[in-house]
Curated annotation (Swiss-Prot):
Phylogenetic classification of the source organism: Bacteria, Pseudomonadati, Pseudomonadota, Gammaproteobacteria, Legionellales
Keyword Nucleus recorded: no
Organism: Legionella pneumophila subsp. pneumophila (strain Philadelphia 1 / ATCC 33152 / DSM 7513)
Renumbered residue ranges of the record's region G1: 19-26
Its job: GTP hydrolase that promotes the GTP-dependent binding of aminoacyl-tRNA to the A-site of ribosomes during protein biosynthesis.
Keywords from the named record: Cytoplasm, Elongation factor, GTP-binding, Hydrolase, Magnesium, Metal-binding, Nucleotide-binding, Protein biosynthesis
Name of encoding gene: tuf1
Protein name: Elongation factor Tu
Length: 396
């Protein structure tokens, strides 16, 4: 079957469903694709097509994720839905599915449950910027006071994790009724309202090209008579010939000037996000730069050594450790292009971390790395990946 082409005239936004098991995430996903396909084109996806999500491997971690897409009046959405709780944990920590916003699904019949809380916490830790709520299974609740009670609980829970609980939009409906085509306030209309809410509440993400210039350094060469060239793929922004740049990480930050940009042996005026380039640096010696540092627009990124991280530890089946680790564990942390040794402090009351667990750690690196909150990393032992993590909060 030929895939239907989306007209890419609309801005693109990445979202996903989160929430407790059996609260209706997958049914809601099916309902959105079905109703939006009727209105704006695209392919409707049935529940079992989404539920049988294929396994993917991201940094050696096995994750089952369903990817669907649909259009609204003003946008093109890519939407992820995971079959199991562990898949969400892995997905959010590895950043396999970056979310510009999340749809938190809460059953009106049950209210918030343990995974509701855990997914909100994960969203906070990994930097999901916006959450909208779909209160599902409204057809099973007759008492409007009960709906209000659940709404208050959800708002309190969101506020307790530093989301704006009082302002977050909550749409009440029944994904099942909508999927069955019932055109009531809790049926099809609720789904349309939810998508309109996503359009208005979740802002369009800043494109990579519009962010400040950043290039993780992969290699360093000296070219006689020209100076030092660093190579790598521009992660974000634009660098123009003649601009000042900073070399950040591992050593003290240095300022220098970009005197040339080269791609495929051709000289360019600038390097843009996504380009694999060589950047010529004025007056910088070959031994003053190394792999693992970044080239960045001055003042936009700082080196840090200590941070709080949300970490997923690979299970034995995924090729991870066979044994737990304890406080003071010292693996390598792989950031962008290089490994740095660091020490882990476990939260109080946590004796050890088992393979397959997710945990919050405080990491102290032995050398500073250019980082912002939200930066992903791998945890390695002798070149073998044993975990994945994300910088949740910078300490120093």
């Amino acid at each position: 079957m030929a895939k239907e082409k989306f007209e890419r005239k609309k801005p693109h936004v990445n979202v996903g469903t989160i929430g407790h098991v059996d609260h209706g995430k997958t049914t809601l996903t099916a309902a959105i694709t079905t109703i939006m396909a009727k209105k704006y084109g695209g392919t409707a996806k049935a529940y079992d097509q989404i539920d049988a999500a294929p396994e993917e491997r991201e940094r050696g971690i096995t994750i089952s994720t369903a990817h669907v897409e649909y259009e609204s009046a003003s946008r093109h959405y890519a939407h992820v839905d995971c079959p199991g709780h562990a898949d969400y944990v892995k997905n959010m920590i590895t950043g396999a599915a970056q979310m510009d916003g999340a749809i938190l699904v809460v059953s009106a019949a049950d209210g918030p449950m343990p995974q509701t809380r855990e997914h909100i916490l994960l969203s906070r830790q990994v930097g999901v910027p916006y959450i909208v709520v779909f209160m599902n299974k409204a057809d099973m609740v007759d008492d409007p006071e009960l709906l209000e009670l659940v709404e208050m609980e959800v708002r309190d829970l969101l506020s307790s994790y530093d989301f704006p609980g009082d302002d977050i939009p909550i749409v009440v409906g029944s994904a099942l009724k909508a999927l069955e085509g019932e055109d009531s306030d809790i049926g099809v209309k609720a789904i349309e309202k939810l998508v309109e809410t996503m359009d208005s509440y979740i802002p369009e993400p800043v494109r990579n090209i519009d962010k400040p210039f950043l290039l993780p350094i992969e290699d360093v060469f000296s070219i006689s008579g020209r100076g030092t060239v660093v190579t790598g793929r521009v992660e974000s922004g634009i660098v123009k010939v003649g601009e000042e740049v900073e070399i950040v990480g591992i050593r003290d930050t240095q300022k220098t000037t970009c005197t040339g940009v080269e791609m495929f042996r051709k000289l360019l005026d600038e390097g843009r996000a996504g380009d694999n380039v060589g950047v010529l640096l004025r007056g910088t010696k070959r031994d003053e730069v190394e792999r693992g540092q970044v080239l960045a627009k001055p003042g936009t990124i700082k080196p840090h050594t200590k941070f709080e991280a949300e970490v997923y530890v690979l299970s034995k089946e995924e090729g991870g450790r066979h044994t737990p680790f304890f406080n003071g564990y010292r693996p390598q942390f792989y950031f962008r292009t290089t490994d740095v040794t660091g020490t882990c402090d476990l939260p109080s009351g946590v004796e050890m971390v088992m393979p397959g667990d997710n945990v919050q750690l405080v990491v102290s690196l032995h050398a500073p790395i250019a980082m912002d909150e939200g930066l992903r990393f791998a945890i390695r032992e002798g070149g073998r990946t044993v975990g994945a993590g994300v910088v949740a909060k910078i300490i120093e």
